[in-house]
């Protein structure tokens, strides 16, 4: 993941279990902000991020195992400009009064080819990478927290943005 984001001009926070914090500090102190996430579950870790940042702060969640971000060009996958999609995602959220954007859940050009560049409304965005405008009231409680996060954002804000040609 750090290779994917190393050239982005944003401040990076690494939320990690207390048991791993010392190793992260040793390796990345001064380059990234290292703070405690949760020792319990991914869901608890994501809720810790929401709690850490102020309301309406723009946050990009990324799991630690992301190796690339790819875009379907109609014929093949190519490297996507992640900075563009982060900025466009937050712009579209602002324009539509939404608080969440994400990416297509499967890397399959066959299914992507009939899609629009992005869609609005209720659709699934996989939790490995998604942008949110922080709402401290929205907490997830289940194992499938990415499904739940999409649904509760749809219920509260009327939809989410999903980029249909982009997959990690």
Each model region followed by its residue ranges:
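Short, well-formed alpha-helical segments that are part of the catalytic scaffolds
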Residues: 1-9, 20-26
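Short, intrinsically disordered, charge-balanced linker/junction segments flanking boundaries
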Residues: 3, 166-168
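Residues at the starts of beta-strands that form the adenosine-phosphate
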Residues: 11, 58, 159
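Short, hydrophobic beta-strand segments that form beta-sheet elements in well-ordered domains
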Residues: 11-18, 101
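Active-site-proximal specificity loops/subdomain of glycosyltransferases
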Residues: 15-62, 67-81
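Short, high-confidence coil segments that cap the C-terminus of an alpha-helix
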Residues: 56, 95-99, 158
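Conserved catalytic core of nucleotide-sugar-dependent glycosyltransferases
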Residues: 69-148
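A short, conserved alpha-helix in the catalytic core of glycosyltransferases
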Residues: 142-166
């Amino acid at each position: 993941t750090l290779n994917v984001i190393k050239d982005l001009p944003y401040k990076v926070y690494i939320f990690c279990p207390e048991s791993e914090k010392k190793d992260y500090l040793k390796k990345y102190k001064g380059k990234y902000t290292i703070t405690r996430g949760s020792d319990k579950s991914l869901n608890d870790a994501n809720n810790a991020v929401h709690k850490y940042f102020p309301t309406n702060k723009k946050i990009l969640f990324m799991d630690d195992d992301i190796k690339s971000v790819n875009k379907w060009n109609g014929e093949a996958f190519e490297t996507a400009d992640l900075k563009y999609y982060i900025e466009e995602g937050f712009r579209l959220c602002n324009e539509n009064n939404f608080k969440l954007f994400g990416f297509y859940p499967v890397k399959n050009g066959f299914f992507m080819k009939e899609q629009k560049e992005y869609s609005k409304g209720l659709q699934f965005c996989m939790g490995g990478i998604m942008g949110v405008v922080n709402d401290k009231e929205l907490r997830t409680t289940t194992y499938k927290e990415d499904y739940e996060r999409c649904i509760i954002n749809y219920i509260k804000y009327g939809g989410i943005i999903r980029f249909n040609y982009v997959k990690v």
